[in-house]
Amino acid sequence: PKKQGRAANLSGKRTEYTPAPQQGCTLFSEVMTMETFLFLLELAGTVAFAVSGAVLGIEKHMDIFGVGLRGITTAVGGGILRDLVVGLTPPRAFQDPIYLLVALGVSVVLFFPFVRRIIGRSKRVFDALMLIMDAAGLGIFTITGMNTATTLAGCTDPLLLVFVGLLTGTGGGVLRDILAGDMPYILRKHIYASASIAGGILYLLLRHLCNRNFHMKFFF
């Protein structure tokens, strides 16, 4: 009987193994869409540039209004100039106030006395903070500015896109320095303009050369 039962089992229909579909890419694309990714990237750039503008206002002993104005101008000024150039009106900063609110909130926090003491304690710390925040904001806004001009305004001309990226990445800093009566950073020995242009050209090359698989589509 055991042999018969075993034979019956062996002669029965085999259940074919069907591997479960891989849901990694689908799940990832649902959780982190391109729109969400760019939104988070723009928020990070907004915070970085708001810190940059507010800290410079604190260094010049401005009141809370001046610190807040410099933080907001640095954070959203480049984006406003970009939108005016490509014809997106009203500018996105006024359509979605989250960027203005984030920049204002960061500026107010940095104005607190204990935060100002930490920042002003060391010139080395101040210079390092400014370098990191400016570099982060410049890189983020150069790329997101070009992407916005492409997706929302339909810009395809490479020269215009590189200019828009430069304007988005450096425009806020230029307005910040003008408000404080300083010569803009990009007109001095700093390489902000050159770095923004180089980053914009590299971004265009990567978009042109990518093989359009999932990962490349997600980022480019």
Q: What residue ranges belong to the model's regions?
A:
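Structural signature of hydrophobic alpha-helical transmembrane segments
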Residues: 35-46, 93-105, 157-168
